[in-house]
């Protein structure tokens, strides 16, 4: 009976993953971001320029930036900003915007289709209708989807 209920009315991502989203600005320092990573235990952060979304910074992108920076003999003297890190993300587009009205099963399919096309999404970014100019109201990662019962 429970299975019938779940299949008949699957949960929507907006119900399950709605939360206050912590975003940064492209001019924020890497140091500031690392403090947030340590404090909040997040691995992806939306980055804006003013109110305009610019990309998703991940711990993988930070590691790629660090590896590139350390390839030379000198560590950069200027404190890196998130704009520097965005250029080192493995996929420039490592995210997809989705509507809060899609089901968790549709969200899972988005992750699967991304992998099938060779473009793995680090996160699905939830807005009212899946439009980039709308306010972010949640983030879903592949691990989040696996934890939903």
Indicate residue ranges for each PLM-predicted region.
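Well-ordered alpha-helical segments embedded in enzymatic catalytic cores
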Residues: 29-32, 36, 106, 110
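PDZ/PDZ-like domain segments forming the peptide/carboxylate-binding groove
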Residues: 25-29, 125-127
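A glycine-centered beta-loop-beta connector
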Residues: 37, 45-62, 111, 118-144
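Tandem CBS (Bateman) regulatory domains
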Residues: 2-22, 58-122, 141-149
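Acidic (E/D-rich), amphipathic helical modules within compact regulatory domains
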Residues: 23-25, 32, 36-77
């Amino acid at each position: 009976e429970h299975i019938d209920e779940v299949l008949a009315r699957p949960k929507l991502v907006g119900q399950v993953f709605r939360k206050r989203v912590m975003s940064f600005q492209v001019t924020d320092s890497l140091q500031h971001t690392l403090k947030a990573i340590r404090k909040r235990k997040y691995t992806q952060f939306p980055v804006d320029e003013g109110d305009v979304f610019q990309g998703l910074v991940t711990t993988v992108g930070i590691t790629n930036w660090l590896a590139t920076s350390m390839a030379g003999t000198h560590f950069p003297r200027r404190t890196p900003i998130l704009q520097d890190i965005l250029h080192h993300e493995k996929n420039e587009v490592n995210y997809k915007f989705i509507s809060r009205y899609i089901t968790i099963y549709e969200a899972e399919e988005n992750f699967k289709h991304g992998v099938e096309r060779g473009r793995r999404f680090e996160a699905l970014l939830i807005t009212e209708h899946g439009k980039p100019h709308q306010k972010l109201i949640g983030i879903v990662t592949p691990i989040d989807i696996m934890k939903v019962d």
